[in-house]
Amino acid sequence: MKRPDYRTLQALDAVIRERGFERAAQKLCITQSAVSQRIKQLENMFGQPLLVRTVPPRPTEQGQKLLALLRQVELLEEEWLGDEQTGSTPLLLSLAVNADSLATWLLPALANVLSDSPIRLNLQVEDETRTQERLRRGEVVGAVSIQPQALPSCLVDQLGALDYLFVASKEFAQRYFPNGVTRSALLKAPVVAFDHLDDMHQAFLQQNFDLPPGSVPCHIVNSSEAFVQLARQGTTCCMIPHLQIEKELKSGELIDLTPGLFQRRMLYWHRFAPESRMMRRVTDALIDYGHKVLRQD
């Protein structure tokens, strides 16, 4: 059985994290040539490439497995050394989360853990349909995802669901939907997506109004908070989690354009097994808080 030298594996990790050999060398305080040599040693050991030398570099499938192993070893090593208790070295936790969870429930869920424990969070924001891939690639140690199935050597628990409502300001509704929300009116009403892969509004409009993808004008804005602002100022209609706009709905600043119609996204918490004590605390905090504020039916 091949056992990697973790010093060489850290070189591979640095190249991926720093998006290149030069910055990886600076991070590790060694020469760029030394970084290349360490990665070459790993590749010779496993008899296959571990890095696709693109810009930025990315790991091969075998490289992803080794990086995932490194994440697990780092967490368990920190715990074994007792750093979690002494606080001498804050533990780095890289998590992949969707923007809507980050804007609503995730930070309150982790509040006590963050205040009581020596943790440095590295939250990598990704669409909930793609966060699990970051865990698969070994870029993170945990992920909030819509995927219910656990990856090999991982654990998964259901957190609860976010219900997305199709909302806008009263002024927007009066301008674009004076006779109600109809298929023809929707063709002229601008919507907003997080990125070009965000298809939530497309799925909602296709399912409920038989509108094919790309048939309505769409802004691209990489911010959950900006969705709320765009809706409040009457610029767009948006799919926004009910949890995020409870006050605006109650005050009438925003209105539900399609009462009774919504998109539900069930969320799951994925992480490597076995869990360290610190990761178990994170898991418990996310599950407990998720069960309080997210839909469970």
From Swiss-Prot:
InterPro entries: ArgP, ArgP_gammaproteobact, LTTR, LysR_subst-bd, Tscrpt_reg_HTH_LysR, WH-like_DNA-bd_sf, WH_DNA-bd_sf. SUPFAM superfamilies: Periplasmic binding protein-like II (SSF53850), Winged helix' DNA-binding domain (SSF46785). Keywords: DNA-binding, Transcription, Transcription regulation. It holds the Pfam family HTH_1. GO terms for molecular function: DNA binding; DNA-binding transcription factor activity. It comes from the Bacteria. Residues 4-60 form the HTH lysR-type domain. Coiled coil: none annotated. Residues 21-40 bind DNA. Homodimer. Controls the transcription of genes involved in arginine and lysine metabolism. Belongs to the LysR transcriptional regulatory family. This is HTH-type transcriptional regulator ArgP.
